């Protein structure tokens, strides 16, 4: 499948190049020595005829915004998860109460002995929840 895609791409490129060569005034794209990267001078087709011009680098104006266009930066709302955030039940600890065998075991005294180890392989919940 990839080979077929590459062949189709090469055929389209060859067709486009032959189409451009049939147009009057086509000079082609020439790169000058000493320019490495994406901002090489291009000859022909620029403003004012066939004078060379330096192409501007892409600064991220595509999808997602960035410098030079696109969407402005909009900060996301704080969804928690930072320092001091609270959870409806403690994060599962994969230690003393973290195996399938201990899931029906009573919770330690920090929960007042009310909770049962929940969430299959998780830790103890402060409520009598078993799931």
Curated annotation (Swiss-Prot):
Organ and tissue specificity: Strongly expressed in hemocytes, with weaker expression in gills and epidermis. Expressed at low levels in hepatopancreas.
Residues recorded with modification Lysine amide: 130
Disulfide bonds: 103-117, 107-124, 118-125
Origin superkingdom: Eukaryota
This protein's record includes keyword Cell division: no
Subcellular location: Cytoplasmic granule
Cleavable signal peptide: 1-16
Keywords: Amidation, Antibiotic, Antimicrobial, Chitin-binding, Disulfide bond, Fungicide, Signal
GO biological process, one term: defense response to Gram-negative bacterium
UniProt key word Oxidoreductase: no
Name of the molecule in the record: Hyastatin
